[in-house]
Amino acid sequence: MILIKLGGSIITNKEKPLSARRKAIDSILNQIKRIREPMILVHGGGSYGHYWSVKYDMHTKPAKYDMRGVSIVKNSMIDLNKIILNSAVKNRINAYCLPPTDFMNGNKPIKNKILTINEIAKSGLTPVTYGDALWFGKKKSYILSGDVIMTMIGKILKPRLSIFVLDVDGVYSNTKSKKLIRDFKKEKPIISKNKIDVTGGMTRKITEATNMSKSGLKVFFVNGNKPKRILDAVSGKKFEGTIFRS
């Protein structure tokens, strides 16, 4: 099974609120449809969910955030998810929408529900889930990052490969010279943060990918602007990107 995260930075224009990169989405899914094994797709919020999260000062830590903000973030994520689903169906991927409320209780994953996602993937459908604003309990809520969903699903289902599709080639040891780290285990990068991204941007992705690799999972970062690299990673060909492994 292959677990794939479509980063918010590649599926939306993060500098322009509520704008999807529809051509990029179509190109990526046109490559993903060629994968001949069960898949699970996760996508980020980009300029949809993150835009409203910042506006309403919502974060990944459960707290008493404005419930109007929760509602607006959820609605915006449904809008973005619909764009992904429409592109998937157009590309003959049998997309099966699974909001995170289907497998989360508070901020903890429900193991048997995640095991069911695997069965759905094996049936010929492709589960599609996403980062979202979730009710935590009483008057508390929080932002669940798509990167955290990757770790949750990865640790329970143990996919053959987990791929983060980004708008850059991978992790750079130096962001100015764009020197690519091909094997993360051998080198540690300097990470610059993007102020708009409440779920942690590249820092969060690296943390989650490292956690996944410590569980024995193989994780790749690839550039979605060159979507054939996704297939190269899946097929085991030499590809441009960053690998995380134990």
Predicted features by range, described:
Residues I2-S246:
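C-terminal catalytic "cap/lid" subdomain
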